Amino acid sequence: MKLSPSKYLPVLLGTLSLTIANPSADCKCFPGDDCWPSAAEWKALNTSVSGNLIKTVPLGAPCHDPMFKGDVCQSLRQQWQNATIHFASSSSVMAPFFANQSCDPFQPRIRPCELGNYVSYAIAAETTSDVQNAIAFARANHIRLVIRNTGHDYLGRSTGAGALGVWTHHLKNIEFVDWDDDTYTGNAVKLGAGVQGFEVLEAARSRGLVVVGGECPTVGIAGGYSQGGGHSALSTSFGLSVDNVLSWEVITAKGELLTVNKDENPDLFWALRGGGGGTFGVVISMTVKAHPGTITSGASLSFSTDTNSEEAFWAGIQVFQDTLEDMVDAGTMVIHIITNTSFLIAPLTAYNKTEAQVKVIMKPFISSLTSKHVDFDVTYKESKTYYDHYNEFLGPLPYGKIRVGFEQYGGRLIPRSVVPNFTETLRQVTNMGVTWVGVATDVGPFGTRATTSVHPAWRSTLVHALLSTPWDFTKPWHDMIKLQDLMTNVIMPKVEAVTPGSGAYVNEADFRQPNYQDVFWGDNYKDLLEVKEKWDPEHFFFVPKGVGSEIWSIAEDGRMCKSAL
């Protein structure tokens, strides 16, 4: 990754008009408006970013006339739920609602391929100056700016109609450093904004280290993942990703490159540690703690109604709920998936523990299942390194096996005190078609409201729950919207009713979450809004359901205008 000095390039300011000419000062300039930049202006921008401006052609274009290519289209259909084809694109998004069926491989060939909610252009940023030029151009022309790395995004924050995208995917620098200050002394790693989980896993392994990253290896580390919190299979051992952040390099709405840490710009440091991606600036790099590598053991366990009565199945779920807190407190992180017919631990992760220790940790759960006559399968595996454990249970690396684009979501942080009494609610929502993915961990010891801006409920949470209903590309759009309506209006209220005062993880939640300010950030929201007003008083940076996003509204065609507050 090349880092240039913090300055606007003369070629940009010398060739682009600073006159904002749009139909309304209350709306961003939109394609087709008189104020939309001319071809010459886009060409000048391209020159200023060394030819890295990309005019969006949707990924699904080969499935539609006049660009139809049958073999390419068939390949796209087969790969559409693989993250790899999307994160290699400057515009494609993985969440199907925000792709809006405007140009996907599953619509009829004769249906026109339209930009829809995709960005109009993107800059494949390779330098700090590329990002600064993108910001300057968007400000000068009063157009929407979107920040994007991989397209892993449930809430529509990395795309937008009529927008210029800053594509950080090529900022791939990884530099290991020694860190020494009054809060941490030890190994650290500086990650460019485009670095993905599988890349840092490999780099850390080569040095005998581990770095907190997501359970999906293709997710970027420094972007929305960490800025929103970032849970990990290592979270019970080291906290959320954001608890491990030591410093950021950030470009502000004014185009200034800042170092942001506990000593320099501490208010912005706090806001970036949980306030959500795309809101306070463009992160260029992030420096995080790197921890010693060691043995890591894992386990998977499953049972279902195929070999158990419904009564025995739900008795097994209750046993799990009763023993989960002790398993986590013994030093494990437990990913579990529950439907109304199946239960799966996938996996339990125990950093710095042997297989024998994992068996001891799980013994009360196993013994209770046996006493309840639940038929189950269990496997254990001790690995020499965390990388090997990850590859075994969350791989195969580098890209893993998590599919994308086939679900829509809701989310909730489930307090410790609630979990043992939660089985009936689980039964109700899974009987409504929900797949429940639980991330059981304890991040309480690693941060406070003073150090991070994630919802304070994280620190007393036992399970972050991600609830999903299916998305079927072959079904009518209105059928899928009905399922999202079910999530927003029926399913999530049931879960919220038994978790009063808690919240949701901002990165994995319902994109239509009511009262999102409180649900995503709790009492931190007021302070986050003050930081937003200080560093971005014009609210140049915007993401849906983000801090300060109330000031903007998005019309049905994607046009972004000031809200009538």
UniProtKB/Swiss-Prot annotation:
One of its GO terms (biological process) is zearalenone biosynthetic process. The keyword Glycoprotein applies. Belongs to the oxygen-dependent FAD-linked oxidoreductase family. The gene is ZEB1. Pathway: Mycotoxin biosynthesis. It is an enzyme of class 1 (oxidoreductase). Induction: Expression is positively regulated by the zearalenone biosynthesis specific transcription factor ZEB2. Conditions for carbon-, nitrogen-, or phosphorus-starvations lead to very low expression. Increase in pH results in gradual reduction of the gene expression. The keyword Oxidoreductase applies. Residues 1-27 form the signal peptide. It comes from the Eukaryota. GO terms for molecular function: FAD binding; oxidoreductase activity; polyketide synthase activity. Keywords: FAD, Flavoprotein, Glycoprotein, Oxidoreductase, Signal. This is FAD-linked oxidoreductase ZEB1. Residues 115-293 form the FAD-binding PCMH-type domain. InterPro entries: BBE, FAD-bd_PCMH, FAD-bd_PCMH-like_sf, FAD-bd_PCMH_sub2, FAD-linked_Oxidoreductases_BP, Oxid_FAD_bind_N. Disruption phenotype: Results in the loss of zearalenone production but still produces beta-zearalenonol. Gene3D superfamilies: 3.30.465.10. Pfam families: BBE, FAD_binding_4. Glycans are attached at residues 46, 82, 100, 340, 352, 421. Its EC number is 1.-.-.-. FAD-linked oxidoreductase; part of the gene cluster that mediates the biosynthesis of zearalenone (ZEA), a nonsteroid estrogen that is a contaminant of cereal grains and causes estrogenic disorders in humans and animals. The ZEA backbone is synthesized from a single acetyl-CoA molecule and eight malonyl-CoA molecules. The reducing polyketide synthase ZEA2 is proposed to synthesize a reduced hexaketide intermediate by using different combinations of its reductive domains during each round of condensation.
